[in-house]
């Protein structure tokens, strides 16, 4: 996508290489992408995101004044429908964009996760000044790329749109927008006066960048990335421990015979019933003792480390009561307070993004004519 946007608009991704690698790593951790010497079946990143999202929206209610126009209320209802998805995308990638999509009355919203758009310019505070997106469209046997570049300016928002017919893995040639019926109403360049920023509501995680110190937002579990990989490696080692602990019977190598596939194995007729205890007739059975408790203790240490780094309540990931760990009432209260602060910060981030989205609906509704009403105050209860 970065190369296509660069070819179409002559702009590069301003994200540093270190941050781009970190974003890929966060999504790999969430989706359990396979890595050498790791067992990703545990998916602790998905557990963290899922539990926090349910806690944040447990008693959520957003409302507008009773006399608000129906179109604006419809927009808020559409925003609520993508709320949980958007927050989870933001927790995974650090940032999620909420794109208002004009409807006959009001707006629907699309949640754009961090790996689905390219920041083309940011200010010193990390706010987007230009952003690029791409949508792949398929018509019969042909594939098209709809590229969009949004740029914030003093005169308002400028949206540039290009449609390309893909040639294999290359961008191909630029074709008119009316080539596809779904793009027939689009124009190559559109200026929307009075629209703030890039015309997208931004949901950012309230964490300082711990990857490269840039203005980019980071994943909620970015500080614990190393521990999450250590957990996956430990799980793979534990699996190996159980595999190596299987009972085995030792036999002389000269008893092995090749089978039809060329693999050496014991013949079935070598195994006969024994009338006595195998230990009394000279057969050696290998059944080693497992060391799983050491691995499980280490696993709990890593999980508690994740909880401490991410401000989670003890027991969210690890076992709540662990033998050998004495905790005072002050420590327990401090952990609960950290978790409460974490949840409140996430609630505040969503409330700010929701308010920004409603403000955009007021501005865009006046321009498009599908919601020509002034902005109404949004109230969010938790």
Regions found by a protein language model. Name each.
Residues 1-128:
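Extended, helix-rich architectural segments
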């Amino acid at each position: 996508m970065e190369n296509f946007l660069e070819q179409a608009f002559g702009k590069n991704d301003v994200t540093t290489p270190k941050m781009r690698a970190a974003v890929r790593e966060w999504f790999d951790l969430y989706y359990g992408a396979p890595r050498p010497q790791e067992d990703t079946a545990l998916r602790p990143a998905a557990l963290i995101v899922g539990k926090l999202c349910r806690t944040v929206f447990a008693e959520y209610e957003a409302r507008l004044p009773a006399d608000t126009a129906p179109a604006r209320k419809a927009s808020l209802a559409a925003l609520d429908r993508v709320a949980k998805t958007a927050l989870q995308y933001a927790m995974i990638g650090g940032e999620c964009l909420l794109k208002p999509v004009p409807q006959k009355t009001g707006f629907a919203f699309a949640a754009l996760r961090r790996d689905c758009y390219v920041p083309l310019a940011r200010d010193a505070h990390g706010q987007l000044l230009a952003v690029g997106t791409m949508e792949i469209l398929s018509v019969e046997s042909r594939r098209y790329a709809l590229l969009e570049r949004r740029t914030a300016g003093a005169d308002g928002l400028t949206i540039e749109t290009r449609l390309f017919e893909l040639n294999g893995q290359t961008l191909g040639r630029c074709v008119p927008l009316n080539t596809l019926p779904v793009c027939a109403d689009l124009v190559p360049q559109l200026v929307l006066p009075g629209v703030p920023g890039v015309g997208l509501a931004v949901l950012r995680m309230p964490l300082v960048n711990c990857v490269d110190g840039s203005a980019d937002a980071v994943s909620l579990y970015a500080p614990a990335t190393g521990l999450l990989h250590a957990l996956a490696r430990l799980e793979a080692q534990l699996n190996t421990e159980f595999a190596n602990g299987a009972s085995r019977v030792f036999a002389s190598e000269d008893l092995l015979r090749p089978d039809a596939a060329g693999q050496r194995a014991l013949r079935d007729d070598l195994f006969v019933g024994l009338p006595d205890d195998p230990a009394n007739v000279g057969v050696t059975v290998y059944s080693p003792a497992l060391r799983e408790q050491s691995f499980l203790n280490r696993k709990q240490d890593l999980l508690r480390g994740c909880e401490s780094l991410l401000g989670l309540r003890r027991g969210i990931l690890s076992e709540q009561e662990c033998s050998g760990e004495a905790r005072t009432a002050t420590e327990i209260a401090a952990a609960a307070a950290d978790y409460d602060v974490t949840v409140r910060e996430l609630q505040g981030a969503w409330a700010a993004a929701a308010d920004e989205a409603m403000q955009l609906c007021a501005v865009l509704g006046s321009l498009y004519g599908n919601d020509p009403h002034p902005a109404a105050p949004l109230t969010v209860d938790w």
